[in-house]
UniProtKB/Swiss-Prot annotation:
Listed name of the protein: Probable endonuclease 4
Record's keyword annotation contains GTP-binding: no
Its job: Endonuclease IV plays a role in DNA repair. It cleaves phosphodiester bonds at apurinic or apyrimidinic (AP) sites, generating a 3'-hydroxyl group and a 5'-terminal sugar phosphate.
Entry-linked SMART domains: AP2Ec
Broad class of enzyme this protein falls into: hydrolase
Gene name in the database record: nfo
Annotated binding of Zn(2+) 3, by residue: 182, 229, 231
Amino acid sequence: MRYIGAHVSIAGGIENAPLRAQEIGATAFALFTKNQRQWKAPALTAKTIEAFRENCERCGYRPEHILPHDSYLINLGSPDAQKLDRSRNAFIDEMQRTEALGLVRLNLHPGSHLRESSEEACLETIAESVNLAHEATNTAVAVLENTAGQGSNLGHTFEQLAFIIQRVHDKSRVGVCLDTCHLFAAGYDLRTEEAVNGMFELFDASIGLHYLKGMHLNDAKPELDSRRDRHESIGKGKIGLDGFAAIIRHPASAEIPLILETPQPEIWSEEITLLRSFEEAQNC
């Protein structure tokens, strides 16, 4: 079975996220655990935590199919010592919030060197940031999201992601979330079944499919290898429906959250139905 959903709003309280996911027919979902535009947020109350857990259980969402995302402000590879410390503290707080909610994974953008340090130094810093977060928490898995390679953001190649993972001490608490738009922007073709199969084979050889903990399903506005992060609705961009059908049918996409971050929330339910139809067609 494929667990397909979207990154839903937490407006009115984080406990509303599973209800919004249910409204669009999702079997998985992503969310922020706080306002992602702010460094600090009030601690989660016992009442909020209980309501969130109850709504997840009532709506049938298991922890492994929920993928919280950390704040975009965080840069775990920052070359600035003060900003790095602030980012690390914020990330630890988000890992702790993830655990408090009873969830098991936290999606993060690896980091950026801001053209002030070498790529290798930045990747080393990111790995050490993850290690420090592990030391300060108990169970949450840090899930590295591949990037589009825009600007000085790292994590756009499988080699860079593997470099980080190799330096994380607790391998059981690190993984990868593959964003299809980012993959395409970074030069990984996804337009055909052959291309998709090749991408997963390369990922397995470079990193290992057992590290794949989730995917973001987004079509891409720009052409292949554009290094531009511009999401498009499923089937409306340069990847196209054949690519997404191949992803849904590939064994690697089973049992992990498959999350839409496409630009039209009003058609998420339609996109979920479309993606699910690819799996149903395979089972016929």
